[in-house]
């Protein structure tokens, strides 16, 4: 990606961010590629049918593990977002006209890939009267129609917190409704200026009250403290959040918020313990965990925590949710041993021709 955003002027905050060189990663943020028959089969299906997933296009470090479990993520609503968050690489601008055939195509892609579980995420569409609520609901309906054995997670924007718009999305009944809080109250406005902390919590609360399994995400390393992380976890749990993922912020490029701190694996383990003590049914915590990482596994755990049986058509998900997960902090500690506090050091930012940055998190 280039330093200058495509099709618009740099914002003042982007110019300030660009003054800080790109940071060097500590030794524990490394990804070893492991492929198996499930991944190879998925790859051949995707390549042969010219399908597109966020997993490929964002260069996700977890693609091999998730595809091995036949899980994949799709981005809907276009490639431009009407809001800008300081950690997210999705372009901000005026989106293209709504593609009303997209839900059918996504559902057919999932059918072709024979997925066990899929996460649907997308851009915020403040330009539309319903802010994209129909699209997020319709894609779930189409997936369920064509793929009754595929679990669906719907990771949505906040729809301005409007109950009627959220109700439309809820009524499509995804297996999991997700809305990412991302950060703590003190720095929320700086990181997510078009969102509101309390409104995001209320979105989770409304989904919980509707009866859905709910999920959210926290990104660490943007300036928050341990006490503030605990506060956010408590707030989410009080709102009825069932599943939490906790991850390290990785800066997509020079225009984005500088990394304030590398969070050690030991700290991720402590955050995971706290989340479980607070009553989250599904917890995944580690530097390279992403909000859709091993999502089917977390859904199974959340259902068990609620004392609910998996639907007959999704009982196969229990089989794919066994064993260790490569990106969980506890796994990293077993692999690398204890880690030392690593100060944030920088390297020179790449030129546009050299740059190969990808989104740290997709909201």
Swiss-Prot record:
GO molecular function: 4 iron, 4 sulfur cluster binding; lipoate synthase activity; metal ion binding
Binding site for [4Fe-4S] cluster 1: 55, 60, 66, 292
Cofactor binding, note field: Binds 2 [4Fe-4S] clusters per subunit. One cluster is coordinated with 3 cysteines and an exchangeable S-adenosyl-L-methionine.
SUPFAM superfamilies per UniProt: Radical SAM enzymes
Cofactor (UniProt): [4Fe-4S] cluster
Domain Radical SAM core: residue ranges: 67-281
Stretches with biased composition (Polar residues): 352-363
Similarity annotation: Belongs to the radical SAM superfamily. Lipoyl synthase family.
Protein name: Lipoyl synthase
Annotated source species: Corynebacterium aurimucosum (strain ATCC 700975 / DSM 44827 / CIP 107346 / CN-1) (Corynebacterium nigricans)
High-level lineage: Bacteria, Bacillati, Actinomycetota, Actinomycetes, Mycobacteriales
Gene it is expressed from: lipA
